[in-house]
């Protein structure tokens, strides 16, 4: 659920940053990166319709190659399909109602939505993508019924959810996940990576070690941008394009539940980027990025 943002004046500042990032993203097709595995489930999004090349999987390590044909739009990524499941005893409709709370303009309702999502659902990414920059998400899944859909583009926009049912059967193999970079999302609402210099074509292991859901968007910014400048921009309440914004493709992973690990393989241009999470704080409803959950990194 990309941009789990409050639709308030302050939040529009964040949209200005993300919107500039994707305005010219992925205008030309590119060859499939070498890390794309033909055995992975191919998840594609066109409009708000998500399709999957397979809907019955074996438990254990599974991979999903995520792409979109949606043109990049100011204010959001092109697509961010989410893999999720309700916990036992919670209906799918209840979990979708929780998501609607999370997208509320009212901070108290948004905070309630975060608490509800933490309680009622389990979230497993997937990816934030723009045309020409697919990503592959690899993770370990237990048997059960899952759903894939772009909740932000449907529930978040006041539209009915469009979902694909995924059935995971027993019998697969679970493998240890490793990547070029480890990045932890913490209970202090911070990103803690093993390094702030990443390969521009590589992989990271996203580990949610927090007590709440987090996602991580990777947004390009001008070289020399600092986290202090980004925080000052959020604090200012500005709604226009930030002075450090840069046109270019974005990447990242969608919402993950505490305790979940997923490997994301990506291919983005070299340069300076900022990691962002806009999930609403479960007490105040303030987006995590406004509270300091942003980190400038370099892709080389």
Cite the ranges covered by each PLM segment.
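Secretory targeting and sorting signals
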Residues: 1-31
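Cleaved targeting-peptide boundary
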Residues: 31-37
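Extracellular/periplasmic metallocenter environments
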Residues: 35, 44-45, 49, 54-59, ...
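Short, positively charged
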Residues: 40-41
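Contiguous segments within soluble domain cores/interaction surfaces
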Residues: 68-111, 201, 208-238
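Preference for solvent-exposed, low-hydrophobicity sequence contexts
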Residues: 114-115
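Tryptophan-paired
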Residues: 131, 234-259
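Short helix-to-loop capping/linker segments positioned immediately adjacent to catalytic or ligand/cofactor-binding
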Residues: 190-195, 204
């Amino acid at each position: 659920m990309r941009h789990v943002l409050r639709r308030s004046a302050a939040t529009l500042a964040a949209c200005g940053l993300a919107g500039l990032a994707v305005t010219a993203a992925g205008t030309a097709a590119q060859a499939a990166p070498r890390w794309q595995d033909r055995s992975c489930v191919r998840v594609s999004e066109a409009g708000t319709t998500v399709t999957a090349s397979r809907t019955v999987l074996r438990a254990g390590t599974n991979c999903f190659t995520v792409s979109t044909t949606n043109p990049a739009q100011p204010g959001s990524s092109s697509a961010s399909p989410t893999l999720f499941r309700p916990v036992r005893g919670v209906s799918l409709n209840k979990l979708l109602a929780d998501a609607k709370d999370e997208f509320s303009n009212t901070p108290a309702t948004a905070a309630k939505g975060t608490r509800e999502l933490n309680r009622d659902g389990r979230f497993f990414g997937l990816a934030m993508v723009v045309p020409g920059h697919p990503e592959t998400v690899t993770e370990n899944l237990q048997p059960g019924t899952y759903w894939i859909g772009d909740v932000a583009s449907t529930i978040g926009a006041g539209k009915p959810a469009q979902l694909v049912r995924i059935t995971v059967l027993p019998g697969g193999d679970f493998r240890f996940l490793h990547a070029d970079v480890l990045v932890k999302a913490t209970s202090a609402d911070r990103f803690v990576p093993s390094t702030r210099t990443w390969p521009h074509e590589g992989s990271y292991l996203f580990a949610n070690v927090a007590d709440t859901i987090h996602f991580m968007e990777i947004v390009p910014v001008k070289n020399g941008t600092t986290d202090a400048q980004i925080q000052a921009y959020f604090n200012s309440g500005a709604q226009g394009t930030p002075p450090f914004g840069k046109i270019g493709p974005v990447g990242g992973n969608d919402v993950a539940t505490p305790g979940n690990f997923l490997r994301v393989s990506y291919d983005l241009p070299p340069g300076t980027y900022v990691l962002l999470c806009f999930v609403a704080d479960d007490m105040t409803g303030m987006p995590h990025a406004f509270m300091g959950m942003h980190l400038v990194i370099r892709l080389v």
